């Protein structure tokens, strides 16, 4: 499909630079194809679902994946550089997006720290070798540290990887370390937050439990590729970067039981949805999954594992807007986004939320 079909005018002021406070005070737009749009609040979610439905949360935890350092090369002067980690390939190896990538070559050494200051790195020992340089600024780094020691060094020297549409407008601060993490995050490894989950407070989770709605956790370590723009003119020419996901056998059995009794599986966020769809058979049976997925969902895709989706408002021409357009229909989503913009909904990672039902959902699934 042509990428420009997913373009729309988004006022810059609509991009939220801070989340709602408290986090469950966000607005919620309910979108069901064929029904009028409904302006609600995230706190209404327990009343909008049915007892026995299951909300599927991505419990990945964001790590401070943005590293600054100095490139060292024999016979040359140092060059400042930045690496945004996005995919761990081994205990001592990460794929990263580098700036300026053109100044890096295989064999280069990088010392990471406070702009590469040696006194900082003497404490952390965080040095790396560039093993590969790929397309789009991607490099493969082999660190001198490995496993938990590397994790500890990254935690001490890295910075929170706020999306560029936020980080370009204001500096990251201490509040972001709380705001840009879900309250249920427990599996370190993401370099971007599963942002639909940012709306859920402990109080809202208690309300979900009280309403008889199941809470299920899966893990997809969100990569920095989620920030990348689609540069191709056609969706067929775009390739997603792989992300690592885990869905165990007990979780698969729980979710299959939910649907077998006639209830719905509701994904909290596009990351949870992408993992569920990656784990599902053509007949909708969810299987255990552990590994990489690069699933790219565009209109025409037949959804197998997800009956509803909680998600934020996404940017024009993004793979995420393509996904929600595949789920609820392109015309439906264009109309919903036009309403959201006109009504002052806040967009992107720190913005408001929507509850989407798929095209062709039976009338019995309608909500009030």
From Swiss-Prot:
Enzyme class: transferase
Database matches in HAMAP family: QueA
Metabolic or biological pathway: tRNA modification; tRNA-queuosine biosynthesis
InterPro entries: QueA, QueA_dom1, QueA_dom2, QueA_sf
GO biological process, any: tRNA wobble guanine modification
Coiled-coil intervals, chain numbering: none
Family, similarity comment: Belongs to the QueA family.
Protein's name in the database: S-adenosylmethionine:tRNA ribosyltransferase-isomerase
Compartments where located: Cytoplasm
Naturally occurring in which organism (per UniProt): Methylorubrum extorquens (strain CM4 / NCIMB 13688) (Methylobacterium extorquens)
Protein keywords: Cytoplasm, Queuosine biosynthesis, S-adenosyl-L-methionine, Transferase
GO molecular function: S-adenosylmethionine:tRNA ribosyltransferase-isomerase activity
The enzyme's E.C. designation: 2.4.99.17
Disulfide bonds: none
Subunit structure: Monomer.
Record function comment: Transfers and isomerizes the ribose moiety from AdoMet to the 7-aminomethyl group of 7-deazaguanine (preQ1-tRNA) to give epoxyqueuosine (oQ-tRNA).
Catalytic activity: 7-aminomethyl-7-carbaguanosine(34) in tRNA + S-adenosyl-L-methionine = epoxyqueuosine(34) in tRNA + adenine + L-methionine + 2 H(+)
Pfam families recorded: Queuosine_synth
GO cellular component: cytoplasm
Major subcellular location class: cytoplasm
